[in-house]
Each structure stands twice: as structure tokens, then as C-alpha cells.
From Swiss-Prot:
Annotated keywords: Cytoplasm, Gluconeogenesis, Glycolysis, Isomerase
Known partners and oligomeric status: Homodimer.
Name of the protein this chain belongs to: Triosephosphate isomerase
An example Gene Ontology CC term for this record: cytosol
Species assigned in the record: Chlorobium phaeobacteroides (strain BS1)
Similarity remark: Belongs to the triosephosphate isomerase family.
Amino acid sequence: MRKKIVVGNWKMNKNVAEGVALASSILENLDGGKMACEVGIAPAYPVLSEVGRVIEGSDICLVAQNCHYEDEGAYTGEVSVRMLDSLGCSYIIVGHSERRQYFGETNRTVNLRLKKALEGGMRVILCIGETLEEREAGVTDAIVTAQVREGLADIEDLGNVVLAYEPVWAIGTGKTATPEQADAVHASIRATISDMYGEADAEDIRIQYGGSVKPSNAVELFGMPNIDGGLIGGASLKADDFVAIVNAAG
């Protein structure tokens, strides 16, 4: 059975003091970080180090929101996998829809980031998902399949890869895919993985759902057969809400 994974993506929220306070509250309310599911939190870059100190020794993973695909060099504003490793990160998110929408990331550059993260010994959360226009045009499966195939190009081992399906139209909007809608896309993603890697890998890979997950809908979403936890945005900024979502997965 796949172990569920819940990751709080803080995005560009919380300074150091606020991040430390939030992480401390999450840790306290999760009984010192002992959970039935896997849990991670992804602060902004400047907050990673201090939050890492808070959760050190617990089972909560430190997660980075992105990485560059080069080891070092003249890439102003970018952060390398080696730097993130030195801060204690164990997961890196790549391909989040906001990175694709606002910063021009493509399936190709997402694939480069994913490769570099895996080469650096990291586990990776690969984000995929369609816009409202694409869903209404009936091309959800085609878009998501292309993102999976191109994002995982030349990747032979999926052991350190988690997928996160995040319908762009449901992120931060209050709209949520119904559990049945989300599970149908997750099933389609598994079919793509089966075609690429075989049935065993398709059964083993974990696929999170992201998009306005909150305590009131988490139990139903996480109860679907193909949904293996969540990539949580806004609700991860309140300790009580995030802990309730974690408990829904446990």
C-alpha cells in the first residue's frame, strides 16, 4: 500500500520569525512530528535554514519550492541543488503551475530541474495540471499526459519521484475538483506511467492532489483510490488547518 504524503507549500509567505512560529506550532500539534503519513513543509528560500532547525530530529521533511538545473554559475537569483542539500532539504518541488505561468518554465526546463535534483540525491515532487480553458476544451488528459511524459523524459527510476496533480483552476480560487474528477485524472496519470514504466511502477508511484485542499474536503479527497495525499497551499499557512489535513491522510 502506498504511504500518503502531505506537503505544505508556503509559497512567498512567512518571514523567518513567522516561519519558525508556524513550524513550531505544526510540530507541537503533530506530537513532535510522529505521523502515520509522510509530511513535509516548503518555506521560501530565506526561511529554509531556520525552519530546518525547528523540525530537525522529527519526521517532518524540509522541502524546497524549486531549484536550478546547473550546479553553480552566473544565474542571478537562482539556487542550486547543492545549496538546498546543505540546508537539509530532502525534497524539491519542480514544475509548479505558478513557476510555469509567471516565470516561463516549460516541460523541458522542468525536466532539467528534475534530473538535477535526482542526481543530487533529492526526492522530487513533479507538479502537473491543466488550466480552466484546457479543461473546458476537453484536453485535460492530453495536457497532463504531455507534462508527465516530457517531465519524466530520460528518467529511468521513479523511486524518488512523487507526482502532484494540481488543476490550475483550483489553486487559490476556492474551487476544488470533485473527488471523482481528481481521481479520474490520477487514474489517467497512472495509465500513462504504466505505459512508460510498467504496471508495477504505476501502482507504486504516489500522486498527490493540490488545489484548495482544506480540512473540510481532505478526508473525502484522500479516500479516493488513486489520491495519495496532498500538496497544500493556503491551508498550510495555518497550523490547525494543516495538521487537520495531515490527520485526514493518516
